[in-house]
Amino acid sequence: MPDAGKPTTGVGCTQAEADTYVPGMKKVGDAGRYSFELVSSTPAPPALDDNAFVVQVSDADGNPLAGALSVALDMPEHGHPSPKQPDVSFDPESSAFTLDPMQLFMVGLWRLTFTFTPNTGAASESAIGDSAVFKFCID
């Protein structure tokens, strides 16, 4: 098994900075308000070229939320974003967002920053957004 900090592939990704994809993987947002679940990736794990992700955002009690979800796709080691933003749709039956296509067009480390703001009727503490970062090594 590779040592932490040593490249795991020939593309410059390190074990310490890349997440290992598993369906249903979760991260708590940077502000601690919401949980971001990567329900699925097609293909799985995320791969070179176009991907489709299903993401669910939940409150602290695990209740799925509706609102506005966006994603920033970039390669931190290369200093550039993906050339195209995915279309984002919300399915009220599953309370999940589909993002498609997620263009991971080069090999290397990709940072996916999901940002969410819930639907609320008034400007309040509950309307404040949160974000979470997933990093995947694409080879």
How would you label these PLM feature ranges?
Residues 2-111, 115-139:
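Contiguous segments within soluble domain cores/interaction surfaces
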